[in-house]
Curated annotation (Swiss-Prot):
The lineage of its organism: Bacteria, Pseudomonadati, Thermodesulfobacteriota, Desulfobacteria, Desulfobacterales. It comes from Desulforapulum autotrophicum (strain ATCC 43914 / DSM 3382 / VKM B-1955 / HRM2). PANTHER family: ATP SYNTHASE DELTA CHAIN. This is ATP synthase subunit delta. Transmembrane segments: none annotated. Keywords: ATP synthesis, Cell inner membrane, Cell membrane, CF(1), Hydrogen ion transport, Ion transport, Membrane, Transport. GO terms for cellular component: plasma membrane; proton-transporting ATP synthase complex. It holds the Pfam family OSCP. GO terms for molecular function: proton-transporting ATP synthase activity, rotational mechanism. Belongs to the ATPase delta chain family. The gene is atpH. Its main location: membrane.
Length: 183
């Protein structure tokens, strides 16, 4: 739980800087680049994060990596601050929170569309456009399949679930019939 609040705080701070200097998209890309770099080089990330190694040596390794990465001065300072506060291991969580803040700033919402069968791109686009009109924001849809739905679709937008599946409709009919029998 602590990592969540800490990551949110750092992501928010970077977002405020990005809003101020107009570089929110650049910082998003740079965060993504550094996470991809750490994913490709887990030993390096472990070395930088491991307190058993000398702190100055780890910092020098981080600075060398950042210098070769072509990152902005703000991003280098941000990552060095994360390191100095022993928070560099939270970089993925910071990146996730930053993504959500950047999307919120742009009026973009991520949603999941689950269907029993594969939907045509035309159908997906119509659903996306309808959702965007209803909530007044741009929608990025992740499309998934779940044959257990039998038919229809389920859409999840944050905490909101719009369930138009045959499975749920059959369940609701069964519950209604049960109540009708006992009445």
């Amino acid at each position: 739980m602590k990592s969540v609040s800490v990551s949110r705080r750092y992501a928010t701070a970077l977002m405020l800087i990005g809003k101020e200097d107009g570089n929110t998209d650049q910082y998003r890309k740079e965060l993504d680049d550094i996470v991809q770099f750490f994913d490709a080089n887990p030993e390096l990330e472990q070395t930088i994060s491991n307190p058993l190694y000398d702190k100055n040596d780890r910092k020098n390794v981080l600075i060398a990596v950042l210098d070769k990465g072509g990152l902005s001065k703000v991003m280098k300072s941000f990552l060095i601050l994360l390191f100095a506060k022993a928070r560099i291991s939270f970089i993925r969580e910071v990146c996730e929170f930053y993504y959500s803040l950047a999307d919120e700033l742009k009026g973009v919402v991520h949603a999941t569309l689950v269907s029993a069968t594969e939907l045509s791109s035309d159908a997906v686009e119509k659903i996306r456009a309808g959702l965007a009109t209803r909530i007044g924001k741009d929608i990025v849809l992740d499309v998934e399949q779940d044959p257990s739905l039998l038919g229809g679709v389920v859409t999840k937008i944050g905490d909101l679930v719009l369930d138009g599946s045959v499975k749920t409709q059959l369940f609701n009919m069964r519950e209604t019939l049960k109540r009708g029998e006992s009445a």
